[in-house]
Amino acid sequence: SVVAAYMV
């Protein structure tokens, strides 16, 4: 998901 990719 987009949220998981942003939480790097």
Swiss-Prot record:
Main subcellular location of this protein, as a coarse class: plastid
Domain of life: Eukaryota
Cellular compartments per GO CC: chloroplast thylakoid
Disulphide bridges, residue numbers: none
Keyword match Chloroplast: yes
Keywords, ordered alphabetically: Chloroplast, Plastid, Thylakoid
Cellular localisation: Plastid, Chloroplast thylakoid
Additional notes on this entry: On the 2D-gel the determined pI of this protein is: 6.7, its MW is: 16.8 kDa.
Name assigned to this protein: Unknown protein from spot 105 of 2D-PAGE of thylakoid
